[in-house]
From Swiss-Prot:
Stated role: Counteracts the innate antiviral activity of host APOBEC3F and APOBEC3G by promoting their ubiquitination and degradation. Acts as a substrate recognition component of an E3 ubiquitin-protein ligase complex: mechanistically, Vif hijacks a host cullin-5-RING E3 ubiquitin-protein ligase complex (ECS complex) and the transcription coactivator CBFB/CBF-beta to form an active E3 ubiquitin-protein ligase complex that targets APOBEC3G and APOBEC3F for polyubiquitination, leading to their degradation by the proteasome.
Matches recorded under HAMAP family: HIV_VIF
Stated name of the protein: Virion infectivity factor
An annotated GO BP: viral life cycle
Other observations noted: Vif-defective viruses show catastrophic failure in reverse transcription due to APOBEC-induced mutations that initiate a DNA base repair pathway and compromise the structural integrity of the ssDNA. In the absence of Vif, the virion is morphologically abnormal.
């Protein structure tokens, strides 16, 4: 029997980012209970030896499955370790892969309170509005002028620990240049 290949998009990430993602997911599943409907599958519960974990996020009738991998073929650079993540949207027998931004938007649609566009009308009418968006990574566009004014008026506090963001998990850190802080100009010219 011949080999059957299946091609899928796997976002290359480092091991520590996957570890942080898994611990944030578990924290919000079991401690804060904001993601209590999510399901975490360990590596030993999978038939595929390359899968290190799976997070199943119900979205109505569909679900989002974020799968992390280990032991993959390394990338073009030495620090491209063999870890990755795939993001899949499933509904019954239909499956498709999506990008991290869309995954964050879908999570935002179904979970976590938001200071939404409707808050503008509610605030004008004198009704109580949700004070802040709990999941700002789910927004990918700039809001209206009124929305921006209200969101700057109501400052959001940084959440500890932060909510798990798929965009942050799959962020491309490999091809970004290193940024140094507090080094103005050439260090040779500064006398160091």
């Amino acid at each position: 029997m011949e080999n059957r290949w299946q091609v899928m998009i796997v976002w290359q990430v480092d091991r520590m980012r996957i570890k942080t993602w898994n611990s944030l997911v578990k924290h919000h599943m079991y401690v804060s209970r904001k993601a209590r409907n999510w399901f975490y599958r360990h590596h030993y519960e999978s038939n595929n030896p390359k899968i290190s974990s799976e997070v199943h996020i119900p979205l109505g009738e569909a679900k989002l499955v974020i799968t992390t991998y280990w032991g993959l073929t390394t990338g073009e650079r030495a620090w491209h370790l063999g870890h990755g993540v795939s993001i899949e949207w499933r509904q019954r027998s239909y499956r498709t892969q999506i990008d991290p931004d869309l995954a964050d938007q879908l999570i935002h649609l179904y979970y976590f309170d938001c200071f939404a566009e409707s808050a503008i009308r509610k605030a004008i009418l004198g009704q109580i509005v949700s004070p802040r968006c709990e999941y700002p990574t789910g927004h990918n566009k700039v809001g209206s002028l009124q929305y921006l004014a209200l969101s700057t008026l109501i400052k959001s506090k940084p959440r500890r620990p932060p909510l798990p963001s798929v965009r942050k998990l799959a962020e491309d850190r490999w091809n970004n240049s290193q940024k140094t802080r507090d080094h103005k100009g050439n260090h040779i010219m500064n006398g160091h």
